[in-house]
Amino acid sequence: MSNNDSSWPSPANRIVNLRPNSPVRNLEMVILRIYPQRLVVSQQFTGHVAAACGRDETGIVGLVLWGSQVNDVRVGDIIRIESGWCRLRE
């Protein structure tokens, strides 16, 4: 499928533009909080994960830090999600 296909959602680069089941590209935000890490063991991934929340000038969003990101990212850091995926959590 081509990225120019109108059925493919365009990547979000601001929190206000995030849509479920859509790619996220070049989204910058400041990390507001990081929750305690936990160990995940599955067929797809084994390692530490931590929930976090961040904000830009348009809103606040939850995200998951994976593997080395858990220890590399700190509250107050400005991060860029270069290639991510938006999911709706209920």
Per-region residue spans from a language model:
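OB-fold single-stranded nucleic acid-binding module
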Residues: Y35-Q44, S68-E90
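OB/S1-fold single-stranded nucleic-acid-binding modules
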Residues: M1-L27, L32-L39
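Short amphipathic alpha-helical molecular recognition features
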Residues: N17-P23, T46, L65-N71, V75
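OB-fold (S1/OB) nucleic-acid-binding surfaces
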Residues: R33-L63
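Terminal helix-to-tail segments of small alpha-helical proteins
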Residues: S2-S7, N13-R19, H48-A51, R55, ...
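Ordered hydrophobic segments in well-structured contexts
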Residues: E28-V30, V64, R80
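Short interface patches used for recognition in eukaryotic signaling and trafficking proteins
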Residues: P11-R14, V61-G67
